[in-house]
Regions:
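An alpha-beta-alpha
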Residues: 126-183
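Short, well-ordered beta-strand elements
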Residues: 15-24, 58-62, 152-155
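Beta-alpha junction/loop-to-helix N-cap segments that form part of ligand/metal-binding clefts
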Residues: 16, 31-36, 50-119
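Second-shell loop/turn segments in exported
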Residues: 25-31, 62-65, 84-86, 124-130, ...
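Amphipathic, non-transmembrane alpha-helical secondary structure
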Residues: 41, 70-80, 97, 138-146, ...
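Short, low-complexity disordered leader/linker segments with a strong preference
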Residues: 1-18, 49
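Short, polar/charged alpha-helical segment
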Residues: 31-54, 169-176
Length: 183
């Protein structure tokens, strides 16, 4: 976990806004979590160096969920205990779906930068900053058809991955709608 110490110093007078984040910083999906956490920490540091946001310094605390739903819920509870006021995350879909129900129960605002399944946004308090899986599959098939890049296409995907399967399903559907032959 990372905290911005300058922001923590201002917490005593109530002028700090606490941002929590959850994502894989270790394990097979760490490349995604580390990219998000590093970018968020850079943004917090830049905002704080420029005087903060509307009179508030930002504190950022990132928790590792190892791309595991149960660990993600535990991380969420830890961040709540820390005093988190907004959740940026989680980074990957399965943990995000698990945490979204908890944030809905608590009325916590949640925005995911990268969990792309439509299952993520079933609660009114959860938002996606990225495109959804169906958008990716549909747009890819449309691009191939609209730019005459071929009439026969093959799809290679990981059937054990919710992310990959979601894109594949909408790609195949749109490819067929566009007259492409999926082999």
């Amino acid at each position: 976990a990372s905290d911005d110490s300058a922001a923590d110093d201002s917490a005593a007078d109530g002028s700090v806004f606490k941002i929590g984040s959850i994502g894989p910083t270790t394990g097979d999906a760490a490349i995604y979590g580390n990219a998000v956490m590093n970018a968020a920490q850079m943004a917090v540091d830049e905002i704080n160096a420029a005087g903060g946001a509307n009179g508030y310094q930002l504190a950022f605390n990132a928790e590792d969920d190892q791309n595991d739903a149960e660990k993600s819920v535990n991380a969420y509870n830890s961040l709540k205990d820390w005093g988190m006021q907004i959740l940026m995350g989680t980074v990957t879909t399965t943990p995000c779906v698990a945490v979204a129900d908890k944030t809905a129960e608590d009325g916590m605002f949640e925005i995911t930068p990268s969990a792309s399944s439509t299952d993520v946004i079933t609660n009114d308090n959860v938002f996606q900053a990225c495109f959804t899986d169906p958008n990716q599959g549909t747009a890819s098939a449309q691009y191939i058809a609209d730019n005459n890049l071929g009439t026969k296409v093959a799809v290679i995907y990981d059937s054990s991955s919710v992310y990959s399967s979601g894109i594949e399903a909408t790609f195949v559907e749109e490819a067929q709608n566009k007259g492409l032959e999926v082999v």
